[in-house]
Amino acid sequence: MRYRHIASALALMLFSATACSSDTVNERAPKTAAEAGQAAYLANCAACHQPDGAGLAGAFPPLKGSDWLTSQSAEALIAAVLTGLSGPMTVSGKDYNGVMPAMSHLSDADIAAILSYVNSGINSGGDAISAEQVAAVRASSGTSADPAQGQAHPGTSQAQAAYEGAPSGVAGVEVKQVRTPGAPDMSEAEFTAASEIFFQRCAGCHGVLRKGATGKPLTPDITQAKGTDYLKALINFGSPAGMPNFGTGGELSAEQVDLMARFLQHTPPNPPEWGMPEMLASWKILVPEAERPTRQMNNYKLENIFSVTLRDSGEIALIDGDSYEIINIIKTGYAVHISRISHSMRYVYTIGRDGKIDLIDLWMPVPERVAEIKIGLEARSVETSKFPGYEDKIAIAGAYWPPQYVMLDGPSLEPLKIVSTRGMTVDTQEYHPEPRVAAIVGSHEHPEFIVNVKETGRILLVDYSDIDALKVTTLDAARFLHDGGWDVTKRYFLTAANQSDKIAVVDSREQKMVGLIDVDKIPHPGRGANFIHPQYGPVWGTSALGNANITLIGTDPDGHPDQAWKVVEVLQGQGGGSLFIKTHPQSRNLWVDTPLNPDAAMAQSIAVFNLDDLDAGFEVLPIAEWANLGEGPKRVVQPEYNRDGSEVWFSVWNGKDQRSAIVVVDDRTRTLKAVIDDPRLITPTGKFNVYNTAKDVY
């Protein structure tokens, strides 16, 4: 699934259809320039403007016979393709709303071929455009060619689309059909099937309640006005409104496209809530506390164990960081998002996208699960108490659906209190019914958890010292809060409000906001990276989904006040599509992944900077090539250090039915040290070293 104005209408017209994706639709390689132009047009433009250039009435302007096209210079057309177009426009006497996304990720040759085909293939007698002309306009406008910045839909980069479009954990639950006046009739079986498709394919962007998140709202007042035929075209071909090309991309059959076009005109079904009765029914103590070991019953160096997510098999692997041997493969919730380690480093808490938490005891002869609970239908975050006197005692988990967080007893996972996050947005002060809980971190300054509420843009300081009389401090940040981490002092929490293109800074000691820092574009730090900059002192860094920027922010208000909470430097990495950036106190390297970059060479490698000579740029290491896995996407994701900072581990993430591996690199020499290639390592993604995770070392 890939998401994709020319300075006037060709841009809008020509490429608002780009939701078709960048994959060629012709299996036979083009033999002529005209065929190449047609193939590129069909792959990138025909979804909206239709294969014959006729457009879609009321939605996407025609290219064939367009008076707008003939009024533009070649340079204007090229600029529109590169930078996009928006706003009202009139084409051949009819009004349209320009929604042409930027297509800068296409090569100069492809853009030239498409424009030439539109000029002389769809139309006749128009001028050919050369790749050299495109290159000149690209250079004069300073437009990047990074494929991760291309937009199949306005505002949605290729990398962001891949990241946000994951299936919702709500799929599979029973929902009640609501018959909606004015909507096409559907049987109960059809409604159930369509609900399942929506939760699997669409809810990640549009929200469970279709109120809009990354994607636009899809409520009946909007969809009924469009009508079934319009919706079928958008679902089938894709559109700038945010829908991928589910039909032409092979994701949905013609019957399913028709089904979804009818379903979207009905009132969205409400998935069931998940309150205390449901949690208690799911809560299981597999090994009571009284029957657990009173001391470590194995010889593993607990500090150097790695908890590795096996995404598609619903498992984690515990791997000995000294011997590289797999200690145990443990069944967990589906697609574990994170592992968090208790302060004592005895317990591992995992949470799956399906809302299931598993508690693993590392003291057992063979580490295994001792308790489990399901805290919602979809979730991403879990954390444990770290403040002195409360170590290992309290846990918290946050859900996407229902939007809530849950306080739990640490050693048993007994649910203690549930708190809803539904409320008003920080900017427009409007009620939001589905504000999802994103990152949660444990404060080192107070007995508090710091909770990011994504859609409202509020950061909650949840005091766990008295759960019966729970006290919550609410800080106004920015919408679409996601992940983040501590500065080196563990006083200041820096977190990305990714769609707002900001980093929010919280002073956990004073329990207040420090400020919001503008960054670009779609920051995604993971926990971020802390190091001493040769010029600016202590900094924290984040990479991005939307471009190649590696943004460094000063974090030392006492020693370097002029640089504190400002962007002090922006490095250029391989490209956009980055999820994680990492260094270690004992390392002089900064590692940046790009697993969601559409360019396979970038997705399969890693960029590494020398912290003592950042101006020298980065070195690229061929991690996937070193793994020697054969076919597959082989995305290289999440650098993770071992306990002492001497090694960096990388997941080489392949398809479920393909070989995957973990590659271990010597941090000092940047050379291959080992490949952990075991058939049980199915789709490895996140890796969490016990010591570094428990002690917030990054």
Predicted regions and their residues:
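C-terminal motif of bacterial Sec signal peptides marking the signal peptidase cleavage site
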Residues: 16-19
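Bacterial N-terminal signal peptides that target proteins for export
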Residues: 1-7
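Electrostatic cytochrome c docking/interface patches
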Residues: 21-41, 55, 59, 130, ...
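Predominantly soluble domains enriched in secretory-pathway, periplasmic, or organellar proteins
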Residues: 21, 157, 162-175, 181-189, ...
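Extracytoplasmic electron-transfer domains, predominantly the class I c-type cytochrome c fold
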Residues: 64-128, 164-166, 184, 204, ...
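Aromatic- and Gly/Pro-enriched helix-to-coil junctions and flexible linker segments
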Residues: 117, 128-129, 137-156, 252-255, ...
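Sequence/structural segment immediately N-terminal to covalent heme-attachment motifs in c-type
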Residues: 30-56, 65, 69-83, 150-154, ...
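Conserved beta-strand positions that form and line the central face of beta-propeller blades
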Residues: 52, 62, 99-102, 209, ...
